[in-house]
């Protein structure tokens, strides 16, 4: 530890103690909050099933920065490079299309064995795994419907895919000793005016009930469902709306996934957390950055990211909220995108843990809104960066932008050689 860091740490300890905050306790709490990194930033959501296929489902990854991962070996190497530069506990979130097999595997036939390499890698890197069925980028999703499809055979294919995915998820949890959160998102919807909005939702309701009919140990597997306002090509009607999935998660007691980009631009998920937690047992968060639409830009340390973190900490939701990231930017170095977004999420959590919440709550309860606002603003100037730097040092990761040197060296030595 350098003398400069020691001095900054001691000063920070004194400054935060003056407002009733124990920074050592804040760092202990931060180590209770893993962030689940999404594998698909590394290859623009291509996967290994059909890497040259088109990305469908009303989502887009824009840009053509060189060096994207082309196979599982490259993707895991890129992830390892990112993991080394991010302090504290992490998880990895996989989609079904990231299976590994020497022969083609239909999505309704995926099995745990197709993900055994990921499990062994996760063990070696001390990571938990989360999972997602992939209900897009497939011939049987080309007309815009999957679990709500009017054709019973096609609908059953997607039901069976999701059921098979749950078995993979439970395998992850059993092998790694930490529950895998499996999130179901489907692109189902219509481009233009829709006459029958009820029937697809009735079919989706019945399909989901069949999907979750097999019981798994919650210590191994947790179901989550995710809504969306619209997607490209499904601007007028989305089967899995917010109201549909809020009702489903409440009535079936599954986890509810809130994606920062899946609502109207004037809505924020930070305001939805406390409301949803009254009715559902768990929340899965997909922290993202929507720019005018669900663009999935890299997460910033901005007001909404901070507000999301603050809601988790202020209400002590550590054991009920699962923090995941969901962005994919192909216009910049993909390893750097992981590092920037994940570090920003962790910085937001740290800042939330350093807030004098008890004091603020007392001011609010007493009606002293002037002091509440004043203290909220003044605490932004407290030396949280020194606490972050100490956290990084203790986890043997760069504290400032020095991590970029490592990414540039990796790009020169590895990424630039990929065609």
Swiss-Prot record:
Catalytic activity from the UniProt record: L-rhamnopyranose = L-rhamnulose
Biological role stated in the UniProt entry: Catalyzes the interconversion of L-rhamnose and L-rhamnulose.
Keyword Endoplasmic reticulum: no
Entry's localization field: Cytoplasm
Protein name: L-rhamnose isomerase
One BP annotation, GO: L-lyxose metabolic process
Cofactors (names): Mn(2+)
UniProt entry tagged with the keyword Manganese: yes
Gene Ontology cellular-component annotations: cytoplasm
Pathway: Carbohydrate degradation; L-rhamnose degradation; glycerone phosphate from L-rhamnose: step 1/3
